[in-house]
Amino acid sequence: MNMLSFKTSFGWITLTEGNNKISSVEFGKNKNKGKSILLTKLQKQILEFTKGKRKKFSTKLKIDGTPLQKKIWHQLSLIKYGSTKTYGDIAKILNTSPRYVGNVCGQNNHLLIIPCHRVVRSDGTLGGFSGLGGIKLKKKLLNLEKK
């Protein structure tokens, strides 16, 4: 397993790769371990994103979860840059509860790539965010995408 931590304008981000797929994208600092072209390419894409110069990511993800969790994460990945959907919007598509969608968002190991920060409450408030920095970071990410 390879790991790469780097600093962005949103704080430290740590990428983890195994078997030539990204296994996690998390906020926070960790020790670098090994080298990987895949990690270096994703680092470049994330740095471009944090500067407002990239709207989509292109990488291979290793996604572990139940079939319903994977469907929810897929729905999140369809939310376009600069847009938001509610937990209820996602729940309705998959015939599940908004609360469950929120719980699955909190289990997302691929922050930014699977954009759980684009999911908000039906009353327009932000809801939660599992990334280090919580709601403040979620608001910052959404503001970046509004520009």
Q: Where are the model-predicted features located?
A:
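Short Lys/Arg-enriched helix C-cap and helix-to-coil transition segments
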Residues: L112-S122
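Residue-level detection of the helix-turn-helix DNA-binding "recognition helix"
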Residues: G106
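…primarily DNA-binding HTH/wHTH and HhH modules…
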Residues: T125-K147
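Acidic, glycine-rich catalytic loops of TOPRIM or P-loop NTPase phosphate-binding modules used
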Residues: N109
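Structural signal for hydrophobic
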Residues: L76, C116-H117, L141
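Generic structural "secondary-structure junction" signal
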Residues: T59-G65, R121-S122, G128-G131
